[in-house]
Structure formats: structure tokens, C-alpha cells
Amino acid sequence: MPAVPLESRLLQALAPWREAGGWCVAFSGGLDSTVLLHLLAQLARSEALPALSALHVHHGLQAAADGWPAHCQAVCRSLGIPLRVERVQVAVGGSIEQAARDARYRAFQANLGEGQVLLTAQHLDDQAETLLFRLLRGAGLRGLAAMPASRPLGGGRLCRPLLGVSRAELEAYAQAHRLDWVEDPSNQDPRFSRNYLRREIMPRLASHWPQAVAGMARCAAHLREAEDLLAELAAIDLRACRQPSELDWPDWLDLPRIALEPLRRLSAARQRNLLRAWLGQLTRLPDSDHWAGWESLRDAGDDADPIWRLESGELRRGAGRIWWLPADWRAAAGPFVWERPAHPLLLPGNGRLALLGEVPAGPLRVDYRRGGEVLALAGRGRRDLKRLLNEAGVPSFLRGRLPLLFRADELLAVANIPGLDSPREGGWRLSWSPPTNDPGLS
């Protein structure tokens, strides 16, 4: 059977995005992205493709790279494709490879318009190297699934249309069309792990197992399918854990949360799968050996206040739910004199407070819980606020941010908590609107 031309394979890979708002090639000037850009430029002569453009990210990590933007400009000019050059700062410390990648993808996202597709030139050999590299690092299924053919990126999508094409095929195309490209000297440095795999390990594997690269890439595709199935299962379980209940909190408490009991009924593996899907959008998660914090939070008694601290925040329990609190969640500062109680009061870092109904006589002040407060209730007399909040099922992490209304030293109301947010005689209610643009409450 004759080989399918690269042009046809590329068109097939990009078929789902033919109606995109534009195709932008991540153009380093190296062999792989040069071939991808040239292929697309040739196809655009005979096919109705989305508008083509290119983006070169300049890391400034080595002197040789300073000439690459000019090379990329010359290539794009010859092909009639507009080019943007984005200069980035790479964070120092840690892995320079990872820091450069992070800076590069931030630039990709910042330059990708709504509905546009960013095209990168990773190929079959890259996929095999990624699988082996992550296997050596003890990655889980998601990591071993290697690079997806496409994924969301900002308001658009990132696509890798050459994952089924070998490095040798790209080299043959470049030579046949007499293309010029730049060589990154750092790609020859075996101190970088990926370079060591590419230059030392992969050739030895291929010399003994000629189909090693194709086999590893095929394995990654199987693992990707398994990972997709687990993602579907996580979505099903998440829906079950997001069903409203009588213990659910109203919309004003806009924090990510899921119900605890449906989660507890799942197997341990399904619990971890669900939490990875949910929390993976919010924070970096630990490896599988460091989930004892989740087990402690899950299994703690009802009167406990367990916390699982993660990189970007923490998980807490309360009101039959598990809640995500970002790292900048904090108790609010007070007190504040409410000089014009007929008008809403802006609370620094904590939204807005309003009195609905007839305004009570003053002077009024707003503060937060400090301990020892009591509240007079109709038919119940004076009751300890801590006990009242326990009865109302108010999560412990929320109590330091609930506004309290005082007249002199008398506690009049607790915002938003039914039965506690208005006086014994009625006539008004204390309403709190948390800041929806605050990461701590959105």
C-alpha cells in the first residue's frame, strides 16, 4: 500500500478545526515547526483553510537564540505568513526546561484569540520520548497518556497534528523541499534529561527493537483512551456529588464544593479519580503516595475540623460538604462604624453589607466573630453565638468572615443566616453580598 502523503495526513488531523477562527503555528524556527509551517503554506494554495499566522517565542536563554527571530521573519516573509515575536522572561531556579516551557505556554495562551487554534509540531518520536520520560518518573495514567492530540488553551485550542508522523519523515520532507531551519545548541546537551533520552537511549532501543518508537506511541494512545474513560467516570461521579440537598448552602456562598456522603460511598480509587478531576482545575495535586491528608479529612468525626492543605489552597469540611478554599482565604478585619446604615457598607476585602427594611436606631458598627458573643432571640432569650452557628450548620471556615451587626456592645444580627439575620421584633434583615470577583469567594 503506497504511503499517504504528509499533506493528506495533516489535513485529516486538522479536519475538526477547519472552521476555526484562525490557525497559528508555534514557530521556533527548528526543523519540526518549519516543516509544519511549510506544509500549511502549500496547502493554503489549494485548500480553503482558516487564516494562517505564526508565533515565535524568544526565551533569551542563549546568545545563539538572538538571531532566530530574524530567521523566522525571513521564512514567514517568503511564505506570505504574518509572524508575531513574543519575548518572555524565564523564571530562575528549579528546572530550566520546565520554566522555559511554562513561559512559552503562557505566551501561547496570551496570543491565542477566541476560537483560534494553536498548532505545535510535536511528532511520533516526541510522543515516545514523553512516554518513556514520564514512565521513569513514576507518572500515573494521565502522565503516561503523554501528549493529547488536542486540548483547550485559553479561549481557543492547542492541536498537535503531527503526532502520527515520525522525525525521519519530517527530515525527508525538509530535505526534499530544501528548507532551512535553525539548530538549538541546547538540544545537544546531554545534561538535559530529554536530550539524554533522545540521543543516548532511544537510538539503542530502536537498534534492537526497530518498532520501539511506533510501539511506545501506540501504547500512549491506548493509555490516552483509558484516561478519557476515567474522565467520563469522574464527570458522572461529580454530577452525583453536586446534587442539591437540604444541607446545601445558598448561592451567596460561591465556593467550590461537593457533597461528602455520595463521595464516601465510592471506592477509594473512584474517590481519587473524582478529586483529581475536580481539584486538578484548582491546584497541583500530590503524587499517589501523599494522599493521607484526604483520608484524614474524609474519615474525621463530625465534630472535627480537618484540613487537607494543598499547593494553592486547602480542602475543608462543613454542612455535609467538602469545600475548596483558595490560599488567600482569610478572616476579615474589623470593626467598622456604619455611619449611614440606610446605604450599603463596603467591607474591605469582604464584599458589601446592606440593611433591608426599616433601619434600626444607632450608633451601629460591624465586626467579626471574636468569641464570647451572645444574641437575643425571640422566645429563646440570650443564646451563645457559637452554639447558634453550630445549630445552623455554618462551616467553621466561614465564621470568621460572617459580618455581625452591633449597637454599642449588643449583638443585633448575623448576616445571611436565617433566624439570626433579623431582630426579635422583625422589621429589617442584615444582607451580605460576598465579593464575587474575590478568589476567596468565587
Curated annotation (Swiss-Prot):
Predominant place of localization: cytoplasm
SUPFAM superfamilies: Adenine nucleotide alpha hydrolases-like, MesJ substrate recognition domain-like, PheT/TilS domain
Protein family per UniProt: Belongs to the tRNA(Ile)-lysidine synthase family.
Entry-linked HAMAP family: tRNA_Ile_lys_synt
Domain of life assignment: Bacteria
Gene: tilS
Catalytic class of the enzyme: ligase
Organism of origin: Pseudomonas aeruginosa (strain ATCC 15692 / DSM 22644 / CIP 104116 / JCM 14847 / LMG 12228 / 1C / PRS 101 / PAO1)
Gene3D superfamilies, sorted: 1.20.59.20, HUPs (3.40.50.620)
Name of the molecule in the record: tRNA(Ile)-lysidine synthase
